C-alpha cells in the first residue's frame, strides 16, 4: 500500500472524520477496521488494522521490560482506539485524542505510505513555518540513499 499526498478534510461536531476519497479506496483493500492513535497527542495516525497488527507482533517479540516498548504502548493505548469505517466513509476520532490534537473543523490528511496522519490545519501551517526543511535534512536523506 502506498498512501501519499495531502487532502484537506473536516472533523464534524461529533468527532467524525470523513476519509478523503483519494485515500478511501486504497484503505478499503485492508478492510473496514482501523486503529487510530498518536505518540504525542498532536496528530492522529490511522492504521489499517492489518498494519497495526504487524506493529503489535513486532512489539510482542520485545521483552516486557523494554522501556521504549512500554512508553510506546502507554501512549498509543492512551490515545488509541479501534474504529470501524461507517457507511459514509467516516471514522470516529477518540475524544481524548481529538481534544489533545485540537481536531475540530479543518484538518489535513497526509498519506504516509501505510497509514494516514491527520493534523489540525493551523498546526500544519505553523509546523511548516517553524520547522523549515534544511540542508541537514537533505544530508540525512542522502545518507539513507534517498
Predicted regions and their residues:
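Flexible "stalk/tail and boundary" regions
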Residues: 1-9, 13, 23-88, 96-146
Amino acid at each position: 500500500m502506498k498512501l501519499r499526498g495531502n487532502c484537506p478534510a473536516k472533523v464534524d461536531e461529533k468527532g467524525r472524520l470523513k476519509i478523503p476519497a483519494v485515500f478511501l479506496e486504497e484503505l478499503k483493500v485492508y478492510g473496514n477496521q482501523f486503529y487510530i492513535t498518536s505518540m504525542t497527542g498532536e496528530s492522529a495516525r490511522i492504521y489499517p488494522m492489518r498494519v497495526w497488527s504487524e506493529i503489535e507482533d513486532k512489539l510482542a517479540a520485545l521483552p516486557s521490560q523494554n522501556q521504549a516498548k512500554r512508553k510506546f504502548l502507554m501512549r498509543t493505548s492512551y490515545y488509541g482506539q479501534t474504529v470501524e469505517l461507517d457507511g459514509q466513509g467516516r471514522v470516529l476520532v477518540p475524544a481524548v485524542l481529538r481534544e489533545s490534537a485540537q481536531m475540530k473543523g479543518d484538518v489535513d490528511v497526509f498519506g504516509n505510505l501505510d497509514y494516514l496522519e491527520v493534523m489540525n490545519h493551523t498546526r500544519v501551517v505553523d509546523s511548516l513555518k517553524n520547522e523549515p526543511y534544511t540542508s541537514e535534512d537533505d544530508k540525512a536523506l542522502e545518507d539513507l540513499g534517498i
